[in-house]
Amino acid sequence: MVVLAASFIVAAPSPAGAYSYGDPDKEDVAETYKLIEAELAENDWDAALAAYQVRRAEIESHFGKDVALTLDANFRDKNKALVLQNYRYILYMNLDRRFTYAEQNINNYAQASLLLAKAKGTFDVLKPYLEIRIPNQIQEIRDHFDKAYESLGNPGLFNLGKKPVDVEAYRRHTSAILTTLKPLFAYTPA
């Protein structure tokens, strides 16, 4: 009886396990790009479209109805090059969005660092594409991410190790990332 009760307690779902905030440096929109790219490499348009449709409402909400309609048309036309090109442009816009929201929350260390981690997750998904186009600048971009993160300061623990926020440094480093990447991302509306 004791064994049965103990096994029930172990097998019972824990309230702590009911909530999952995911990996802080993973960006769902970017992770979906990887799925779409892999499915299109196999010419599995149904699976690629299904992956896109999971994120479509989010894409429309963050990047506009026209962007979502463009991707809808790219999928309908089965234009692999435009699906990937326009989705990569969404990821570039997502970097900008995350940088902007991190700056707006720059005095909230936890929130700003989470948003910057999401931006870094987007960059990591784009890295294979970027390594072909700008291999000599990847480390420079990583350095800018590190310095942008450092510019968020550090609230310290009981004021030990506390460092102030440097908004200008944050802007300088995130702007350098966006400026370097912008020429590599084109958008072709439907």
Report each predicted region and the residues it spans.
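Mature extracytoplasmic or organellar-lumen-exposed domains after removal of signal/transit peptides
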Residues: 17-190
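Bacterial Sec-dependent signal peptides at the C-terminal "C-region" and cleavage site
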Residues: 11-17
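Bacterial N-terminal signal peptides
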Residues: 2-11
